[in-house]
């Protein structure tokens, strides 16, 4: 299963990074960290004036689709997203997604929206990295972690001032996310084990969530009508990457899917 492969490789890479730059050193660098986490909850919670919130993804490739965007310039992409997106998601996984954590720092210098570090996070070291490089929130995948691990990592992120998007794909994941104390819960239409899609998943899982949670729909989203219908059942925000990455005019694509124009 691809998720298991990615997690295994992530742990191997992490071992090398810890040897090269120990966690203690990373922690010390926080004393000089110029980045203060921004208001993620405010950015993502839907309102009457803005019922559809967009997390626009900066993504070069994926294991399911291969290379998505050849002319990949993270700063330029972020600047095109800036006007209509409410937050950015930046892939930092290097092998399958061709990501780089340096992209977070680059984008933060030139754009003002909160930034999600989207990676396969399994260790506190990666959360410290996210903060040092300028992220405002991180992704934790419920299926990749035990209940105890999820709760521990989520609480550590909150302790550092970072928010957490906990990604789910079934009722068991949702229970884990709620028990761990997640404020933001993502529902990924794509199964990370076999890449199959279930576009009806939000309708099944949203009713299981307590009031007050920020709900994010992920994967397979490419038109305004989808977002409008999902917003009616309680989805606050929509994480969209591949659709935008395949556009020549990214800015117009974000406006169209958000406003239906």
Swiss-Prot record:
SUPFAM superfamilies: Ribulose-phoshate binding barrel (SSF51366). One of its GO terms (biological process) is L-tryptophan biosynthetic process. CDD domains: IGPS. Its EC number is 4.1.1.48. InterPro entries: Aldolase_TIM, Indole-3-glycerol_P_synth, Indole-3-glycerol_P_synth_dom, Indole-3-GlycerolPSynthase_CS, RibuloseP-bd_barrel. One of its GO terms (molecular function) is indole-3-glycerol-phosphate synthase activity. It catalyses: 1-(2-carboxyphenylamino)-1-deoxy-D-ribulose 5-phosphate + H(+) = (1S,2R)-1-C-(indol-3-yl)glycerol 3-phosphate + CO2 + H2O. It is an enzyme of class 4 (lyase). It comes from the Bacteria. The keyword Nucleotide-binding does not apply. Pathway: Amino-acid biosynthesis; L-tryptophan biosynthesis; L-tryptophan from chorismate: step 4/5. Belongs to the TrpC family. This is Indole-3-glycerol phosphate synthase.
């Amino acid at each position: 299963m691809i998720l298991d492969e990615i997690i295994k490789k992530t742990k191997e890479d992490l071992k090398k990074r810890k040897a090269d730059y120990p966690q203690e050193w990373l922690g010390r660098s926080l004393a000089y960290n110029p980045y203060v986490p921004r208001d993620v909850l405010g950015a993502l919670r839907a309102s009457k004036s803005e019922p559809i919130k967009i997390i626009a993804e900066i993504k070069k490739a994926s294991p399911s689709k291969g290379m998505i965007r050849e002319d990949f310039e993270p700063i330029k992409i972020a600047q095109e997203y800036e006007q209509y997106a409410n937050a950015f998601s930046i892939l930092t996984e290097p092998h399958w997604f061709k990501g780089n954590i340096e992209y977070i720092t680059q984008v933060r210098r030139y754009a003002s929206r909160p930034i999600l570090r989207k990676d396969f996070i399994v260790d506190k070291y990666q959360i410290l990295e996210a903060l040092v490089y300028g992220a405002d929130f991180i992704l934790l995948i419920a299926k990749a972690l035990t209940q105890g691990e999820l709760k521990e990592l989520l609480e550590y992120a909150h302790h550092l001032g970072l928010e957490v998007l906990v990604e789910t794909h079934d009722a068991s994941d949702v229970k884990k996310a709620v028990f761990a104390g997640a404020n933001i819960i993502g529902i990924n239409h794509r199964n990370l084990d076999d890449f199959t899609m279930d576009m009806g998943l939000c309708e099944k899982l949203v009713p299981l969530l307590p009031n007050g949670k920020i709900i994010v729909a992920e994967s397979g989203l490419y038109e305004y009508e989808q977002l409008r219908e999902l917003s009616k059942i309680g989805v606050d925000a929509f994480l969209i990457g591949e659709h935008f990455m395949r556009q020549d005019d990214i800015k117009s694509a974000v406006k169209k899917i958000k406003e239906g124009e």
